Amino acid sequence: MIIAKNERGLKDQIRLILDKWSDFSEADNIRRFNEYIGLRLRLRRVALGLTQTKIAKLLNVTFQQVQKFEKGVNAISLSKLVMFCEGTNTDMDYFFRILHKLEKKIYINGGR
């Protein structure tokens, strides 16, 4: 996945992931969910004016690992996500409010 360079591009990528959510297998959706979380992570980091290196120090990982989180290559653990939220004063809802929308979309589309 190519990551957009600006906020609008990131939001467009997020919208694309959500629009296609119920069209894919469970394994594809897990990958897309990791991409979604990664894009939200990047969007928040950029909005706060933080570098990947600063986030890496906050999470006690390398900046390369932060890159992988942001690209959805590696899933960020819940404990690391909590560390990110606490260290950047971000509500966890910022990442997970989408789950309700996805549930609704999947239900409307007949359970798939």
Regions found by a protein language model. Give the residues of each.
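Recognition helix of helix-turn-helix/homeodomain-like DNA-binding domains
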Residues: 59-76
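Conserved hydrophobic/aromatic packing and binding residues within compact polymer-binding modules
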Residues: 41, 55-56, 66-69, 95
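Short, basic-rich loop-to-helix N-cap that marks the start of a DNA-contacting helix
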Residues: 73-86
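Short basic helix-loop element that most often maps to the first helix and adjoining turn
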Residues: 39-54, 58, 83
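N-terminal flexible/basic segments that precede or flank functional cores
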Residues: 1-33
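Short, charged recognition helix plus adjacent turn
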Residues: 2-9, 96-112
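Short amphipathic helical patch at the helix-1/turn junction of helix-turn-helix
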Residues: 35, 46-47, 75
